[in-house]
Amino acid sequence: MIKASAVAALATATVPTQAQLTRAAATRGYKIKNKRIRQSIMGWTFNPMPTDELIATCVDIGLTGIEGINRKFYPAARKAGLEISLVGSHGFGKGPNDPANHTMCIEKLIDGIDVAKRFGAKRVITFVGMETPGIDRDQARVNCVKAWKKVIGHAEKNGITLCLELLNSVDDSHPMKGHPGYQGDTLNFCIKAI
């Protein structure tokens, strides 16, 4: 439905594994050595750690990028040599699945694209949005595509990829372990949308 070059990625969360370092091990001078995998970090998950300290830690251990931080820290992250891995736009709560949100989503996506261009980032995140009474999955998908088509040219012109995030709606044991009611919660839905 939309050019794959502009909406090419589904952002997915990673699950911690036994192979990951403990916090204590990471503080003993751990450094990524061979750089076969370019790694970045989701900043908000380290709250309440100060962002400037997080940026310095990312550089110290050899990460290449950071995302999920307040935009006011982008200049410091770039100066430290980190990429901005993903620029935010509208949140996941109010998405383009509901036409009532289109103006806001489009404005925030265009702003995200402009910010990404300014800071040398290559990706901006978008979401589907929470389920809205009276809007089924098929209509939600059509609504999303209508909104995304209004920003896709701007993204392509600036060399920015829009990344559609698929969020889990099943696990509701903690506010950030699931997103009950999120409409873009299946790979099938998201693939059909892009």
Regions found by a protein language model. Give the residues of each.
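N-terminal export signals
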Residues: 1-21
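Active-site-proximal flexible loops/turns
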Residues: 10, 74, 172-173
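C-terminal segment of N-terminal export signals and the immediately downstream linker at the start
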Residues: 15-49, 57
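Surface-exposed charge patches
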Residues: 30-32, 56, 75, 114, ...
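Structural motif corresponding to the early beta-alpha repeats
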Residues: 45, 61-152, 156-161
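Acidic/histidine-rich catalytic cores of soluble enzymes
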Residues: 55-59, 145, 149-194
